[in-house]
A protein has these predicted regions:
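Conserved donor-binding/catalytic core segment of Leloir-type glycosyltransferases
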Residues: 157-174, 180-184, 192
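Short alpha-helical donor nucleotide-sugar binding micro-motif in glycosyltransferases
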Residues: 103, 222, 230-235
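Conserved acidic donor-binding segment of nucleotide-sugar-dependent glycosyltransferases
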Residues: 273-286, 293-300
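Glycosyltransferase donor-sugar binding loop
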Residues: 6, 167, 189-205
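Membrane-proximal helix-turn-helix segments that form the acceptor-binding/catalytic region
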Residues: 91-109
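Short hydrophobic beta-strand element within catalytic cores of glycosyltransferases
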Residues: 260-263
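Nucleotide-activated donor-binding/catalytic signature segment of Leloir-type glycosyltransferases, i.e.
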Residues: 204-226
């Protein structure tokens, strides 16, 4: 058998978490001996669809007519569409209608977490839904002191500087406005955010935030995977201020790199992460300010090793075995 990883409009998502997820699926399937193709002209038995663009919807319908098994990855929800791009809140009800239409073309749905599975079930989608992480390639994420030093040199940070890192699109949902407020309130620390969203797609508050000029605030734009790994290695704290996620691949990356993490206390992470055990959590700005200072001044113990144990359960070979079990239930193997 062979699986098609449908990559229609890949250029639009390849630098996002969805782009990473497609690559991880290829690794996971190949780790258990399931051949993969990216070419829809080749013969295949099953298709993985990861996006909700019109061409993805049409490909799913086409594959159904040809008797192919359709595995639709439900990365998107109405909840994580809101507070993202300009006009997203107005369009959220229409977006929900559209993704339901896309997802209903599948034989099964795979979504990264039990939290996102519950959201989809609440939409009234009756398809079988599996909660399966996008996974992380632990072999590819190793903390490197030399790489961390190169990161600090590249951005002019001294060995004594305390550096706080975040990664994501420029959008309110990702917490970028709060990131800027924290930089204002904690001038003794360096704040750096990797990622980008075109100005035309940003909301007014986000545009205002990223134009803020502070000596300790840095927005260098997009970074390669190697540059991100250097940043994870060279920073003192990974700060994940997101308000809504279906998983959060950059958080998995930070944990795999054994970075100290501080995340927002939101429902998706309620059972997955325990405050003070495998990460630290906060909610309000004042609480984040206090936690950041306690962590960076050494007043709180490290959660790095427990965080690594948590993410190790999502290593690519483990995800591959679970995908294989799903394929067996679909009678593909």
């Amino acid at each position: 058998m062979k699986t098609l990883l449908y990559a229609g409009s890949l250029k639009l998502v390849e630098k996002s978490g969805v782009g990473q997820a497609i690559y991880h699926q290829q690794q996971a399937l190949e780790s258990v001996g399931i051949p993969v193709t990216m070419d829809p002209k080749e013969d295949f038995d099953a298709v993985h669809i990861n996006t909700i663009f019109p061409n993805s919807f049409l490909m799913s319908k086409r594959c159904r007519r040809k008797g192919k098994k359709i595995v639709y990855y439900a990365h998107s929800t109405k909840e994580d569409f809101r507070n993202s791009f300009r006009g997203s809140n107005l369009l959220a009800p229409l977006f929900k209608w559209w993704i339901k239409r896309c997802y209903r073309t599948a034989d099964i749905l795979i979504t990264p977490t039990d939290y996102s599975k519950k959201l989809l079930q609440d939409y009234g989608i009756s398809k079988t839904i599996y909660a399966l992480s996008n996974g992380i390639d632990l072999q590819n994420y190793k903390r490197s002191v030399p790489a961390g030093c190169r990161f600090r040199e590249a951005y002019g940070f001294s060995p004594e500087d305390k550096v706080i890192l975040s990664v994501g699109h420029y959008m309110n949902r990702k917490g970028i406005v709060d990131f800027v407020e924290l930089a204002k309130g904690l001038p003794q620390y360096q704040f750096i955010w990797f990622g980008y969203t075109p100005p035309s797609a940003r909301t007014a508050d986000v545009n205002k935030a990223v134009k803020t000029q502070l000596p300790n605030l840095h927005f260098p734009g997009l970074a390669t995977q190697e540059e991100l790994k250097a940043a994870y290695s060279g920073s003192d704290l990974f700060l994940f201020l997101t308000h809504e996620e279906t998983e959060g691949i950059v958080l998995l990356e930070a944990l795999a790199m054994k970075a100290q993490t501080l995340i927002r206390d939101i429902p998706i992470y309620k059972d997955w992460f325990q405050d003070g055990i495998n990460t630290y959590k906060a909610a309000a700005i004042e609480e984040f300010q206090n936690r950041i200072q306690e962590i960076l001044e050494g007043k709180l113990p490290s959660t790095v090793e427990e965080g690594y144990k948590t993410v190790a359960q999502r290593d690519i070979p483990i995800i591959g075995e679970k995908l294989k079990e799903i394929y067996q239930k679909l009678e593909l193997l």
